[in-house]
Amino acid sequence: MMMPTLMVMAKLMVESGIPGSIVNIASVAAKRPLVGAADYCVSKAGVAMLTQVLAAEMSQLNVRVNAIGPGFIETPMTQNIRADNEGNMMAMSMTPMGRYGLPVEIANTALFLLSDESSYFSGQTLFPAGGMYTG
């Protein structure tokens, strides 16, 4: 479903002649293997690569394409991890900042990527992940 939606939006942006920005949602799992989650990791790596390919194809058309790869965020998706002492310890051991991200932090990253403040960004995946890739 992602590809048809992206292609329709890209076509509308190009036809309008107005520069545009597309933001995809990947995950830290695009870069970091998670045991027992091969399907999720592979699909998110695919989103990151699709972002790069579309950015290369669409840059000349004034459409920027980027992605966000969140770490552990306080959402229903991480509720079971947060509720389980062992799961929570595992998540925090991977997150140097020692806390879960907030949904608003992901929203603010999207706002940045959609704004003119990021006009020279294209083909990038930003990782708001509490320092997960610092070491």
Language-model features: where?
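The catalytic Tyr-X3-Lys active-site helix of short-chain dehydrogenase/reductase
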Residues: 1, 33, 38-46, 107
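Active-site helix of classical SDR
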Residues: 6, 43, 51
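Alpha-helical segment proximal to the catalytic Tyr-Lys
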Residues: 11, 56-60, 119
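Residue(s) in the substrate-gating loop at a strand-loop-helix junction
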Residues: 27
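Short, flexible catalytic-loop segment of classical short-chain dehydrogenase/reductase
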Residues: 31, 48, 69-80
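Active-site loop immediately N-terminal to the catalytic Tyr-X3-Lys motif
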Residues: 32-38, 60-61, 98, 116
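Short, small/polar-rich loop/turn modules that mediate ligand/substrate recognition or access, typified
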Residues: 59-64, 121-123, 129
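A conserved structural motif in NAD(P)-dependent oxidoreductases
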Residues: 95-106
